[in-house]
Amino acid sequence: MISSNDFRPGVSIVLDGSVWRVIDFLHVKPGKGSAFVRTTLKNVQSGKVLEKTFRAGETVPQATLEKITMQHTYKEGDEFVFMDMESYEEGRLSAAQIGDRVKYLKEGMEVNVIRWGEQVLEVELANSVVLEVIQTDPGVKGDTATGGTKPAIVETGATVMVPLFISQGERIKIDTRDDKYLGRE
């Protein structure tokens, strides 16, 4: 159990049978009446955002999350096969369980799998990945009227906006959180 006074961004709680992560909180102490904590919560499974107010000192169950380091070994049909780096056991996850970051997942890549009990809540990739550009238009000298970027398709199939000087076959670094080009590798 965790007190609402101990809420901080990133704390996970159980509310109505599902896991919610505290995104933002504000401890309010009005002149009249009792203090309360206004929170913004995000459902870890669905991504739904909720604003909820708790009385100061109110206790709620804290979610005990387990973080496991796994390596993506191969893809079989619609499932991705991962190997636990400690026990060497295999596990399978669907693209829906991995989420939108599946477009940066490559064989041999290590990820952190966040579990609540036996249920997989999310898969965390590294903040940046290095991938090879497999298709992009050639940059034309002096063509900067469009802001100096062009679309490029990387080896995993994801499309990323890159500067005009990037050519096919180059390895680039991409931020997986906001799909931005970070530089050449």
UniProtKB/Swiss-Prot annotation:
Pathway: Protein biosynthesis; polypeptide chain elongation. One of its GO terms (molecular function) is translation elongation factor activity. It is found in: Cytoplasm. Keywords: Cytoplasm, Elongation factor, Protein biosynthesis. GO terms for cellular component: cytoplasm. It comes from the Bacteria. One of its GO terms (biological process) is peptide biosynthetic process. Belongs to the elongation factor P family. NCBIfam families: efp, PRK00529.1. This is Elongation factor P. The gene is efp.
